[in-house]
Amino acid sequence: DGKPAADIPVRFQLLSTAEGTRTTAAVDSPVVLTDADGVAETRIKLGDKTGSYQVGSEIMAPDKGFLVSSKPVKIFGFNLVGVVVSVLGGLSLFVFGMKLMGDGIQKIAGENMKKLLQFFARNGIVAVLAGTLVTAVIQSSSATTVMVIGFINAGLLSLVQSIGIIFGANIGTTVTAQIISFNLSGLALPAITIGFLITLSSRRVISGWGETILGFGLLFFGMTMMSDELKVLGEFGSFREAFNYFDCSPVNGWMPFLAVLGAMGIGVVATVLIQSSSAAMGIVLALAGSGLINFYTAVPLLVGTNIGTTITAMLAAIAANRVAKQAALAHTLFNVFGALLMLLLFYVPYGPERIPVFLYFINEITPGNAFAAVPQNLERHIAMAHTFFNIAVVVVLLPFIRQFAMLCNWILPIPNNAPVKITMLEPNLLSAPSIALKQTIRAIKVMVED
């Protein structure tokens, strides 16, 4: 009759729990009578896992003629500590795996990779290739740039030579994103097992292969941990709404400018805090894989990670000579120029759907459609955008390396007739023992001559 029905028994039962819940979820009062307002209430004790819990409610009065006798209710349980531990734990494994891979490959290659930087830096194009190769091997553009600053401070490289290597480092760092964009999580545990067993070898090269395989497994295992936790959070409406503040999806045909700047700023801050653009890219890929961000938002985020990674070189150059400071400045200017170029391309539409031309290009050369209602192969699109973005900036600036060096010298000039301080025993060269040893011998000779 449309009026509240009091004293009607309603039964509540737990239909499903969040996947992986270890503690038992339960209904406090399985059967409850409705009150004067026709409302039946009970409390649900959720498990320890973040995720969806489904509760069924059934009216136990078939003779009353209610139009609806049962209704399932979906509840989202949130374990803050569990989420933080899982995401940070996954990120830690990811970064450690990345470092282990780099260390393993360096063991296999010996000191040859680091000697490449000094040997091939004489030609701009070859210097870019050397920077790309070394960074792809050691899995860190920051480490390459810090090493370059060490070479400059020790008088082993000039500013013009170092700029080519820095350009290449930005391309080499995209290899990590390319690797993790493939769905190889099923190989993580076998790789960890096999890699660990191989590391037990007493032979350096074989042990290096073991570290490489073990690092590969840890990298994907950490990525899977982050992705799985973020996918569950993606079901939580309030959590998804938080990402709308920097959603860069076009409004009236244009990407919202403030949202784009906000996403780039978040990329900068995240990379500065983590001290690794590759790790920050891993988070971007995990967010995209969980459906929390789209292609429009991911690209400004990755542009921000490129700017944030320059902080490491800046810190390393504080105690170095003026030329090393100019190299750190070159790294920063290169990445800022790339960000400004990409910001401009965001507002150059192409095609009937007025998609930004760079995003349109990436979507055309990558399998799947990143702009579909349900984005396809989104992680691969983001990795390809990261790689081609850095390649494009290098192609634009490579013919102007000398002019770029002149700009750095104009911003941070060396006083006339002022000698450039050379530090033979440069601490940043310790990661390349053979070169550090040569510098030590050189320093001893200078001491003897003096």
Predicted feature descriptions by range:
Residues 111, 115, 119, 123, ...:
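Alpha-helical transmembrane segments of multi-pass membrane proteins, especially transporters
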Residues 391, 398-450:
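Non-transmembrane accessory domains of multi-pass membrane transporters/channels
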Residues 135-140, 146-172, 178-187, 197-199, ...:
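Membrane-interfacial helix-loop connectors
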Residues 76-124, 217-269:
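Helix-loop-helix hairpins and the membrane-proximal interhelical loops
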Residues 86-99, 131-135, 192-201, 215-226, ...:
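Hydrophobic core segments of alpha-helical transmembrane domains in multi-pass membrane transport
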Residues 1-79:
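The feature marks long extracellular or luminal low-complexity segments
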Residues 88, 213, 324-337, 362-403, ...:
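Structural signal for the N-terminal portions of transmembrane helices
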Residues 234-255, 351-378:
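Membrane-interfacial helical/loop segments at transmembrane boundaries in membrane proteins
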